[in-house]
């Protein structure tokens, strides 16, 4: 049985324009999702960066780059990554009929295989990765950039594949399996980039052939965010443990 009552059929736009994707931030479901990033994810990343500087100090590692270089460089990376996440989240919201944050509205009700999602399955991860690296550069922490960032990337890949995509398979069935086989998770292929530039869908389905939006969300979808919170706490604990070991 589903965790929620049947969903109203959303008005979907399969290929939303760029401006509409950015304007979608005015939707409560979308800006609440961004609030989680600002008030939960960003502070957690700041704590990890601080732990990285403590490990640097314990190991005698100097800060990377002069402050006059790393601050504008890092801010530029954070801004670029943030704009990319803003765009792809807006695209998913308009084309998929739901927020990327399942804790807000249960998530998309239609599978999206156009725009940036015809190129890779999780385009927002690239923007987040760019922002996290930029944050580490601002802090100047070698430990954060060399050790923490790869761990965060692995964590993201694992949770996307075995948590987020599990719900996508339950929600969209065999179509998502075909989509996953055709579209890589994070590293775009030339064919995917070409599809994006030509504004082609990954599954090459005509609009008239698309199935209707799903009528309900998979059981357990509302608890997905709790897994991410537990993961963040465990990661911070791991990095704090490394600091304790080397201090």
Regions found by a protein language model. Name each.
Residues 122-125, 175:
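An acidic site on a long C-lobe helix of protein kinase domains
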Residues 112-123:
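Short, amphipathic, aromatic/basic-enriched membrane-interface segments that mark the entry/exit
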Residues 1-114, 130-247:
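Membrane-anchoring alpha-helices and their flanking helix-loop junctions
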